Amino acid sequence: MTALFQSWGLPYDWAWFVSTIIGILVIALPLMLAVAMIIYADRKIWAAMALRRGPNVVGPWGLLQSFADGAKVFLQETIIPAAANKGLFLLAPIITFTVALIVWAVIPFAPGVVLADINIGLLYVLAASSIGVYGVIIAGWASNSKYPFYSALRAAAQMVSYEVSIGFVLISVVLWTGSFNMSAIVEGQRAHIFGFINGYGFNPLLFPMAVVFLISAMAETARTPFDLTEAESELVAGYQTEYSSMSFALYWLGEYANVILMCGLNAILFWGGWLPPVDWAPLYMVPGIIWFFAKLLFFFFVFSWVKATVPRYRYDQLMRLGWKVFLPLSLFWVFLVSGWLMLTRYGV
């Protein structure tokens, strides 16, 4: 696209800037629309699990319910508590929402369909996603209320705890594929696993890490059964208690954007991304972006299924799972994958 704008007479710097802005909008605007539909799907899945109808009034089959909710929130007044730190109170949801968007810059939807195909894409994802904890901490502190503050402390401890496990899981993936580039990680899953399984993206050696990543992603995004940050019986609405109007909506948008991101990362890192499930010629007639979103939606259904069926963990159980189970397991798997590669790939 930069070359196209240059052909129209724009200098290279301006052509690059305009093409980058267009690329950001092409990703951000559909993502916001996807969040609205994902919220609708989430509510429909919960309703089906509880033998209810769910949203069914606004629009055909209730499809416009999320947009009606968004319009209602947009028209509400933003109320700032008298004792709150006004500047930080308004900044916190912006941080959370912005971080949820910038990570998508390196997510490849199909071959060549990525905003920034950088060689440290996976490292960028880990670094950028870890910034989200600041939005939570600032919200809890700036609200100047005990319930948001307690919730922010819980959220910070929870997010930091499971980021460690996720980091070691990502190291296992990098060792296997030999690259931090997200597109290269997907292409690295084309090879037949162990030379005899003719399938894309399914790696028996990394499968336990796929499970660890999925559960850790639920904890990282504070989804049930790990939503201890907003346990209604203890902390009212968590660190969002004092928020209303669009500032509250930004947290919701950021949360669901992060959920979609984690589902997409799971598909990219462990299940072949845009590659078809098996190496069968007719499956290549389906565009790669369709395979990517099909896998993403499957994992989102798993997220919603777990949320509707699994009871909430106690906080001590949550921390024990992260530090005493997932951390040792993921660290052990780094050594296991390293040893396997030394014996098989490098002939040591």
UniProtKB/Swiss-Prot annotation:
Q: Does the keyword S-adenosyl-L-methionine apply?
A: no
Q: How does it sit in the membrane?
A: Multi-pass membrane protein
Reactions performed catalytically = a quinone + NADH + 5 H(+)(in) = a quinol + NAD(+) + 4 H(+)(out)
Query: What GO CC annotations are associated with the protein?
Result: plasma membrane
Compartment list: Cell inner membrane
An individual GO BP term: aerobic respiration
Family per UniProt? Belongs to the complex I subunit 1 family.
User: What is the stated purpose of this protein?
Assistant: NDH-1 shuttles electrons from NADH, via FMN and iron-sulfur (Fe-S) centers, to quinones in the respiratory chain. The immediate electron acceptor for the enzyme in this species is believed to be ubiquinone. Couples the redox reaction to proton translocation (for every two electrons transferred, four hydrogen ions are translocated across the cytoplasmic membrane), and thus conserves the redox energy in a proton gradient. This subunit may bind ubiquinone.
Give the protein's recorded name. Answer: NADH-quinone oxidoreductase subunit H
